[in-house]
């Protein structure tokens, strides 16, 4: 299990690297959806929920974990692609989602051009 100080440190790092919202609009003004491509209880799921909980407390808004498993990460990735790029749908993922388009030509997205990474949460 990941210790609380590590999660807090990683969350602080994530907040430091997050872009500042432009204009007078308050962010977040509604719950943030956190897409997770693995089933509940997996390492990616646990990390996503811990980071979401800490960010929710700091930002004063809830993070809703949305597990979209299957399709070798494609179900979650397609949900992210279809979502507006407004910062209210985020995805926590493993390197698998970024490698899929290079392994299967049927996947029509570019992980470098189509997505904006926010933070590196954990390394092994």
Question: What residue spans do the PLM features occupy?
Answer:
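N-terminal (or domain-start) structured segment
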Residues: 23-116
